[in-house]
Structures are given as structure tokens and as C-alpha cells.
């Protein structure tokens, strides 16, 4: 009831305290339900951090294998950058569980959101993963995906530049109506025929 009218930017500490209360005096499952509810009830800026907290508590209370559902829900609900970060973390978890193919698929998914020139972290993680666990074919596939993502990012940048160049430039100077303006307000009108 305390959280029904609580603004989302202030809800995070209340959810965490409520979950810890359930952990200490209640049931672990109820605490996890509180943390799940917190992922929807906090401000958008805190959602990724809340998902990470929920995943850590799930691993602690019921085991690492149960974190899969939380990761999958987080990836589907967060924006591109959050999904990229959570997918890369999920790949590490899958690798700990011995699921090499699932980890590779998650890294491939996360890499779709990261331009190799501006955000190389995921690409370095995938590169290191393929060096340790991959084959020549899987490494070549990683390089192919990397070129594809780079090309898509370049195309998107080019389209944005073209769109910006099409927009009219607004002048900071006021526009003067030349039809009513005179060069010299003291000018005397002289008829040329009289000369």
C-alpha cells in the first residue's frame, strides 16, 4: 500500500527495504516478487540497476539457473542500451553454467546494439570469447556480424547527416522587407523630366 502512491523516482529505496524485510522475516519467494515489482515501479533511469539487483538476489536466494527468466524479461523490457548490457552479462552467466552456444547467441544479440567504433566493450568481450571457446568458423561469423553492424551504423550516420543538411538554416538577423524600405529617409523626390 505504501508504494501505490509513491512517485517512481522515490520508490527504489522503499522497494529494496521492503524486499529485505521479506528476506529477513518472510519468505524468499515473496522477497523476489517484491524485487520483480520493483523493476516495473522504479524510474526508467533506475530500471537497469534494479534488474541487476533482482538478478543478484535471485541467484543468492534460489540459484543461478533461476536467473534466466529474469534476464530474459529484462532484455525484452529495457531499451537498446540496457538490453545490450544485460545480454552481455547474461552471456557471462551462461558461460559459468557451461552453456557456450547460448553465451555466443547472447553476445551476437548484444553486438547488434553496439557500434564497434563507438562502443567496443561488447565486441571485445565477444572477440575474447571466440578466441577461448570458438572455432575458426565462429570467429569468421563474429567478424562478418561486426562488418554488418559497422555498415549499418555508417548508413544511419550518413542518413542523419543528409537529413540535417536538408533542414533550412535559420538566420539570427531580422528579415527586412525591401519593398517598403528606403535607402535614405531624407531623400527628396525630384522629377527627372524637369531637368
Which residues are covered by each model-predicted region?
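Alpha-helical solenoid scaffolds in eukaryotic macromolecular assemblies
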Residues: 1-195
Amino acid at each position: 500500500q505504501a508504494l501505490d502512491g509513491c512517485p517512481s523516482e522515490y520508490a527504489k529505496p522503499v522497494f529494496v527495504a521492503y524486499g529485505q524485510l521479506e528476506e529477513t522475516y518472510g519468505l524468499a519467494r515473496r522477497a523476489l516478487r517484491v524485487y520483480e515489482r520493483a523493476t516495473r515501479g522504479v524510474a526508467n533511469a533506475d530500471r537497469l540497476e534494479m534488474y541487476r539487483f533482482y538478478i543478484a538476489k535471485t541467484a543468492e536466494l534460489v540459484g543461478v539457473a533461476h536467473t534466466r527468466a529474469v534476464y530474459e524479461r529484462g532484455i525484452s523490457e529495457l531499451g537498446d542500451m540496457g538490453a545490450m548490457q544485460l545480454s552481455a552479462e547474461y552471456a557471462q552467466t551462461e558461460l559459468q553454467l557451461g552453456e557456450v552456444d547460448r553465451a555466443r547467441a547472447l553476445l551476437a544479440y548484444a553486438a547488434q546494439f553496439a557500434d564497434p567504433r563507438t562502443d567496443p566493450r561488447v565486441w571485445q568481450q565477444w572477440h575474447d570469447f571466440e578466441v577461448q571457446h570458438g572455432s575458426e568458423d565462429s570467429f569468421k561469423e563474429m567478424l562478418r556480424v561486426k562488418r554488418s553492424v559497422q555498415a549499418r551504423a555508417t548508413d544511419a550516420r550518413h542518413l542523419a547527416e543528409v537529413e540535417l543538411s536538408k533542414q533550412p538554416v535559420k538566420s539570427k538577423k531580422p528579415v527586412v522587407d525591401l519593398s517598403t524600405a528606403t535607402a535614405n529617409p531624407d531623400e527628396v523626390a525630384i522629377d527627372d523630366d524637369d531637368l
